[in-house]
């Protein structure tokens, strides 16, 4: 598996879960690392991690903070060329799962006429010119299959990237849920704000970036808190917009009501202990945290952002949907959800059968079939 990345994201965790499941079944899995991918996952299985460049070299590149992260990744990929070529020659019978923006490995798989089976997993909502180049180059590979995580991406990929060969395109959900998540969600939360039974806790989880649109969530919560003073908003995650969000919280006089807890090792217990989960993103794939929240039993609201969340909650069957980037619509939905807790719990219960498709065992089996057949 190779998925060059600056920092560990949900997509990397998806690939790692697939790798771990296949490894547990006796398959030999190797993770080829260029950047920070799989940095935050615990490797307690037989999966071999291979750093194509020394970790110290990549950390050195990250020191130059004036460099755009994309430039850092380009430099890292250049340094990884010779080690990757050596790996190709030593592992001619290997198959490859490529993720995120794998233009670097694809070029050398083509140049050296590698006939291995290759699966290119397309995640999120690809919009960049670089991704267009990835698609164009991937078509030169002789034995490639494409995977997308939900049906909604089919039309998008076809229309935006001249993708006519839908026969090579498979829909396989991401590996999001497993027994460990359910078990960890049952752990006790120590923070005092979760101990007050008179408080109603709303939660948002994710990187503090423009994509996640936490500023809209805070503005909507500001309106809600006027109606329901007992409400508390908890936000888990770090990111470049943290200072901006803190200033917004201060300007709205919400410093006692909005709690930024940063990155936590076990977000699941916080979601399980909350009354309502909100995903306010401007764009998403299927929405991993949305799936996690539903999977552990927390009622959910999501924006109708492109391209996957609406499909994840089945057009509102499993939660509430609000207009993308609309403060007022989100405020109304939060009010509605808290006023109808029994209905919201019913929606969660109705999602249980559908959520099974996101369990790692099922997802890994589907990927394995692509390589076997």
Task: List each model region and its residues.
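N-terminal strand-loop element at the rim of the active site
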Residues: 1-9, 13-15, 21-71, 162-163
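Conserved donor-binding/catalytic core segment of Leloir-type glycosyltransferases
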Residues: 195-212, 218-221, 281
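Short acidic/histidine- and often glycine-rich active-site loop of Leloir-type glycosyltransferases
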Residues: 292, 305-316, 320-321
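Aromatic "clamp/platform" in nucleotide-sugar-dependent glycosyltransferases that forms part
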Residues: 263, 282
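Short His-centered aromatic/hydrophobic patch
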Residues: 77-80, 97-104, 122
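Conserved acidic donor-binding segment of nucleotide-sugar-dependent glycosyltransferases
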Residues: 315-327, 336-341
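A short, active-site helix/loop in glycosyltransferases that binds the activated sugar's phosphate group
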Residues: 144-171, 176-180
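Short hydrophobic beta-strand element within catalytic cores of glycosyltransferases
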Residues: 299-303
């Amino acid at each position: 598996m190779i998925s060059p990345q600056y920092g560990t994201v949900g997509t990397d965790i998806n690939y790692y879960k697939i790798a771990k499941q296949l490894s547990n079944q006796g398959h030999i899995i190797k993770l080829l690392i260029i950047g920070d991918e799989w940095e935050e996952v615990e490797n307690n299985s037989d999966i071999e991690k291979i750093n194509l460049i020394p970790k110290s070299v990549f950390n050195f590149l990250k020191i130059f903070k004036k460099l755009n992260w994309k430039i850092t990744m380009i430099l890292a990929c250049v340094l990884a060329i010779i080690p990757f070529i050596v790996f190709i020659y030593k592992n001619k019978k290997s198959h490859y799962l490529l993720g995120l923006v794998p233009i670097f490995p694809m070029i050398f798989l083509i140049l050296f006429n590698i006939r291995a089976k290759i699966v290119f997993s397309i995640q999120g909502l690809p919009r960049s010119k670089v991704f267009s180049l990835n698609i164009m180059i991937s078509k030169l590979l002789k034995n490639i299959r494409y995977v997308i995580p939900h049906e909604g991406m089919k039309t998008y990929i076809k229309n935006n990237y001249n993708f006519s060969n839908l026969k090579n395109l498979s829909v396989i959900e991401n590996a999001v849920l497993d027994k460990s998540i359910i078990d960890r969600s049952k752990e006790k939360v120590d923070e005092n704000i979760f101990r007050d039974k008179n408080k109603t806790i709303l939660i948002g989880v994710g990187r503090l970036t423009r994509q996640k649109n936490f500023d809209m969530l805070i503005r909507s919560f500001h309106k809600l808190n006027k109606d329901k003073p007992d409400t508390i908003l908890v936000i888990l995650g770090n990111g470049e917009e943290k200072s901006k969000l803190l200033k917004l919280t201060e300007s709205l006089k919400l410093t006692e009501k909005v709690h930024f807890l940063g990155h936590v090792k076990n977000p699941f217990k916080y979601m399980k202990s909350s009354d309502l989960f909100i995903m306010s993103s401007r764009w998403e794939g299927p929405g991993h945290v949305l799936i996690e929240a539903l999977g552990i039993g927390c009622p959910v609201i999501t924006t109708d952002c492109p391209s996957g969340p609406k499909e994840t909650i089945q057009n509102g069957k499993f939660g509430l949907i609000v207009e993308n980037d609309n403060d007022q619509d989100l405020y109304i939905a939060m009010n509605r959800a808290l006023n109808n807790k029994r209905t919201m719990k019913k929606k969660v219960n109705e999602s249980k059968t559908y959520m099974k498709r996101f369990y790692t065992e099922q997802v890994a089996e589907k990927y394995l079939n692509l390589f076997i057949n």
